[in-house]
């Protein structure tokens, strides 16, 4: 039994350690309180994206636009504490974060503009704008990690 446990642990470490060592994302160090605040913001961003998708799935694009602007758009920055967080971020990370907030505001505009287009074209506009938001999230998580 001990041999099997040891063998399983050895295989796990053999597989896991290289994966951890290959993490080439830039480490961003900040005080624990700020890191926790940033992580909470990112979790809220994910909840917001989920809410936007739920509203779109219900056919309530106007609510999705309002949610995007009020919780992720440029008008939401004060609520996120962006002013005191930005100086702690490397410039590239800060730029990606700003692009997320701009993309959310553009999404809200795209939803309203889509109402003036044929349904299929309007849907493509909305999904393209939504993808800009998720692309910003993916770019940041692919390039940076917090400590």
Which functions belong to the PLM regions below?
Residues 1-4:
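Positively charged n-region of N-terminal signal peptides that target proteins for export
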Residues 7-16:
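Bacterial N-terminal signal peptides
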Residues 24-147:
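Sequence context surrounding c-type heme c attachment/ligation sites in exported
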């Amino acid at each position: 039994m001990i041999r099997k446990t040891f063998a399983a642990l050895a295989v796990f470490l053999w597989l896991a350690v290289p994966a951890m060592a290959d993490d080439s994302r830039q480490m961003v160090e900040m005080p624990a309180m700020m890191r926790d605040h940033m992580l909470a913001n990112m979790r809220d961003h994910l909840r917001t994206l989920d809410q936007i998708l739920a509203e779109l799935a219900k056919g309530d694009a106007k609510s999705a636009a309002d949610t995007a602007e009020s919780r992720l758009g440029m008008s939401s920055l004060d609520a996120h504490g962006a002013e005191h967080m930005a100086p702690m971020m490397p410039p590239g990370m800060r730029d990606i974060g700003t692009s997320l907030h701009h993309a959310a505001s553009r999404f809200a505009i795209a939803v309203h503009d889509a109402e003036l287009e044929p349904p299929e074209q309007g849907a493509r506009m909305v999904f393209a704008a939504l993808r800009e938001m998720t692309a910003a999230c993916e770019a940041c998580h692919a390039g940076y990690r917090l400590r």
